[in-house]
């Protein structure tokens, strides 16, 4: 993977993978069917709203391959789906249209072109996909680690409201930690 090229893509030009093991759709499923399944089973509302509010996280790699004339998303189907519906709200399934918040112009600008690593083929990416989704990866912080981080950020001058937003906690919870 370290020698795979990295390219910029408009998410609307990427093809969601019908073979994505997260969802069960026919191999010839339309992109609309895949998006619907992603919304139904893969918490796209939450992810799209997080991206709409905060943008994409740097360092989260998307992996694509060129397959049958399409640029197929092998890793990052949830993120790409989220970006697609933020860029083109008409792609949002009817049942979810009211649930997606409108992104800022800055976020729209940032997600119009996203970086992806280009695998030479699907097979070459299999090992990476397996490691990413089945083996221990990023270890979640313990509650104590979160408290230490909040205290350090506060000591560095970060406002309580900002720390609370970063950690998805109430301001009161942060105040209790930094006392």
For the regions a protein language model found, what residue spans apply to each?
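Short, charged/polar connector segments at secondary-structure boundaries
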Residues: 1-104, 110-117
